[in-house]
Amino acid sequence: MAQYKGTMREAGRAMHLIKKREKQKEQMEVLKQRIAEETIMKSKVDKKFSAHYDAVEAELKSSTVGLVTLNDMKAKQEALLREREMQLAKREQLEQRRIQLEMLREKERRRERKRKISNLSFTLDEEEGDQEDSRQAESAEAHSAGAKKNLGKNPDVDTSFLPDREREEEENRLREELRQEWEAKREKVKGEEVEITFSYWDGSGHRRTVRMSKGSTVQQFLKRALQGLRRDFRELRAAGVEQLMYVKEDLILPHYHTFYDFIVAKARGKSGPLFSFDVHDDVRLLSDATMEKDESHAGKVVLRSWYEKNKHIFPASRWEPYDPEKKWDRYTIR
């Protein structure tokens, strides 16, 4: 290695410039890492919300045993939703604290490297390095004292990794505002009305339409449909809602599900989407039944007694209970 030949002052100046370049390079690396972490956190948002409904549905399914009333089911579903949202918020806060701790450890490692380098440098450089470290420590203490004492803070020092009560309270407040805004939008969508075309099925179809809000449950829909069907069908005059089934796209839908659940999850059945309630031609009657189309068919309102007698005959032989974990990404004709 070539030996530097010059005065002690020039050697100290050269070493100072080298340390300054190293510091700028480290700051650039920290900035790149922070940008990459923010990008990763933003990319995880959609995945969190897409997995949110499936996790709540799985928890509801595992915690419900036997027959329960509709009110108990709805209360349990809403409680699970609130608990899931609080867990996601807490997990996000823990992730942010973990990142802050990692940045703090990285800062300590950089200081340790600087300390080792300064031991090999000249006395002049050691004094300058000590003064710079003391200024950074004083700036960090001034930042932790609160916003009222920030007048003497060095604006060039990065203190984002330090704990800040006011910043955490502001983040929690913003997170709560976003949650309330999301709740308000969800309630607004639930209040929107949609026209549902269905067919009472007793071996042949008898088509009817009703208007329901998207937040209505399948049981509420069957109750409204039964009120209109009793006038025309004698076998329904003594029937109750619990004796009826709602079959959509060859799937038997549970009474406690809401239409909003299928819309948010964009759930699909064997022959079409469960989140669309307008009517198109049956895909099995088209020229090419293997072509997947975003088309919906009229759901069937059926007596359970009729289904038990005819479940070995088409079309009842195709019907099966709805399972949110089972995906029907392509149409089936068998």
Swiss-Prot record:
Tissue: Widely expressed. Abundant in testis, where it is expressed in seminiferous tubules, not in the interstitium. At the cellular level, expressed in primary spermatocytes and round spermatids, but not detectable in spermatogonia, elongating spermatids, mature spermatozoa, Sertoli cells or Leydig cells.
GO cellular component: intercellular bridge; midbody; nucleoplasm
Disulfide bond sites: none
InterPro entries linked: FAM50A/XAP5_C, XAP5
Entry's transmembrane regions: none
N-acetylalanine modification, residue list: A2
Domain of life per record: Eukaryota
Assigned protein family: Belongs to the FAM50 family.
Protein name: Protein FAM50B
Origin species: Mus musculus
